[in-house]
Design a protein with these regions (language model features):
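Membrane-embedded alpha-helical bundles that constitute the cytochrome b-like, heme-associated redox core
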Residues: 2-285
């Protein structure tokens, strides 16, 4: 039970209706008349589409490097290079000749853990997959305050959701991988007969930019730059970065989350098309 204050300042008790879910209206009285379900449905379809493609791409274990056609393009799903399949580009990050499965499997653990624990993605799949809640002023699906899964709702304080707190640590791995993908973008200027630039080079440059925009706009990065300060004047450099750079990126964090997600898939697909010979990568110079 909580209280509200009237205009006169007198407290007014507010009871809890057993037919209401946490924070939402009665199940039979959803007052929203707009198409509130479009956003969670679109997010659901978008994430399912990416997961389906990423699963295929990670398990195909082939044609992830276009060195066979004179292009130094390495799929971001398979970067850094862990096998001899991409040694012609001059760098191998580990002798994984003993690894019989797709090298994308151990690689994707790190960026996947970063995105799964991301504040924006958490909101997205909580709403679109778990319907918890599906939208503002819309009740959770399948339970009330007294019955069903939500009756014992504990937020992110118990296992497994307490593991979402690793996000602040996975950010450091995300920075490393952003650096690796930047290296790949630079390497994409190398051709078998010298320095040049192809359409794939441009795709990898955009990929690195979007990854950095998403990573540096992360809430954990924003806290790292501006958190723990009693006054900003004591750390003017951190305050400048926090206010003029990280916060600006954070304001568009949702946009960069989606753009970087699908551009990674696009970069992988383009590399696969070039490596298989399905298309010719046009060279600008």
């Amino acid at each position: 039970v909580t209280t509200l204050n009237t205009a006169s300042g007198a407290p007014v008790p507010v009871g809890i209706d057993k037919n209401k879910v946490r924070g939402g209206p009665p199940r039979s009285e959803i007052t929203r008349t707009d198409r509130w379900w479009i956003q969670p449905l679109a997010i659901f379809l978008g994430l399912v589409a990416f997961m389906a493609y990423a699963t295929w791409a990670a398990l195909r274990n082939g044609h992830f490097y276009a060195g066979n056609v004179g292009r130094d393009y390495l799929s971001p799903f398979y970067s850094p290079c862990l096998t001899n399949s991409c040694t012609t580009n001059g760098y191998v990050w580990g002798g994984w000749s003993w690894w019989r499965l797709s090298p994308a499997i151990p690689i994707l653990i790190f960026p996947l853990s970063f995105r799964l624990s991301c504040y924006y993605y958490r909101k997205s799949y909580y709403r679109s997959f778990w319907l918890s809640p599906p939208a503002c002023a819309v009740p959770d699906a399948g339970s009330t305050r007294e019955t069903g899964p939500r009756a014992k709702y504990s937020g992110e304080t118990k296992f497994p959701l307490i593991m979402q707190n690793i996000h602040r640590y996975t950010w450091y791995f995300a920075v490393i991988f952003a650096g690796i993908l930047t290296f790949d973008a630079i390497a994409a200027f190398r051709f078998h007969n010298g320095i040049g630039m192809g359409l794939g080079t441009l795709i990898f440059i955009v990929n690195a930019i979007l990854i950095w925009a998403y990573t540096l706009g992360c809430h954990s990065c924003r806290h790292l730059c501006g958190g723990g300060l009693r006054k900003f004047s004591s750390a003017p450099t951190r305050h400048f970065i926090w206010k003029n750079f990280v916060t600006k990126l954070n304001e568009h964090h949702q946009l960069f989350a989606w753009l970087s997600l699908f551009w990674i898939a696009f970069a992988d697909f383009y590399t696969w098309l070039v490596a298989t010979g399905a298309i010719h990568d046009p060279r600008f110079f």
